[in-house]
Amino acid sequence: IKNAVIKKFKRENKLNYTSDQITVGTGGKQVLYNAFVATLNKGDEVLIPAPFWVSYPDMVLLAGGKPKFIKCGEEDGFKLTPAKLKKAITKKTKWIILNSPSNPTGAAYTKKEIISLGKVLLKNKNVFILSDDIYEHVKFDNFKFFTIAQIKKLKDRTLTMNGVSKAYAMTGWRIGYAAGPKNIIAAIRKIQSQSTSNPSSISQAAAVEALNGTQSFIKKRAKSFSDRRNFVVNYLNSIPGITCLMPKGAFYVFPSCKGLIGKKTKIKNDTDFVQKLLEKQNVAVVQGSAFGLDGYFRISYATSMQKLKVAMVRIKLFCESLG
């Protein structure tokens, strides 16, 4: 499987690695967690742009580090800016996490944006970079994916994580992998050898076939996701009180419900909003505050168009009841 991963990075990202620069874990989560356990000491800070995937902060805390959040609002497309990154870095900063395309927002960094962030990091040589690329192949509108390890001078301190769950719909097979500096990969290997050992050999064999096989279906599937995204975003923006940016990747949207909070009902925040939506209309979404940004909620459109149409009608009815 390491050979398949090496070929993937060379084929798709023009990155060259050797087998001692590759780790394979029981899902991307284990790879991330092992990396933090291997590198964090008490007091070390990990910069986490918010909104963020919910597991990042707890992984850092479990490893003895300190999560430091950088608010990236709707006005910035939910993306980190060089100015905010520069301001957040201190002598205690050990890692910066970059996730593109993003869970929960679907925001994706362009090559130009990645290079701009890279210029800040080039000046801060003690900061490691964790690039979570798990949604690399779920992208739309001819978006050109670029990962920060492609900046030559940053490659040696970048850990690039990916996996088969999102690209190949193999979530339950639990195969994640990463490429990075030999010393960090070796430390990750030590931790994994004393905890879970190797991932399932059956899953490894399946992942090899996925990585080495034809990739043509990925674009076809992205078209289906794109159609659902367009429908959901356009419908949400037609609902008074709701606004929603058009994401460039992943299979989530992150609409604002600020215009519906504090109206004639007792809904005071996004948590109240999603709770009442579930109670009144049986639609399950996740509050933005769970991802570090209040006043929003996340919808996954990784389901059928039929179910999405029903959900949108129910969300509209619920929102109208709050006006």
Label each PLM-derived region with a short phrase.
Residues 15-19, 23-323:
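PLP-dependent class I/II
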Residues 1-7, 101, 199:
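A structural motif shared across PLP-dependent enzymes of the aminotransferase-like
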Residues 9-10, 28:
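Basic, alpha-helical helix-turn-helix
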Residues 4, 12-13:
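N-terminal Rossmann-like NAD(P)+-binding subdomain of aldehyde/semialdehyde dehydrogenases
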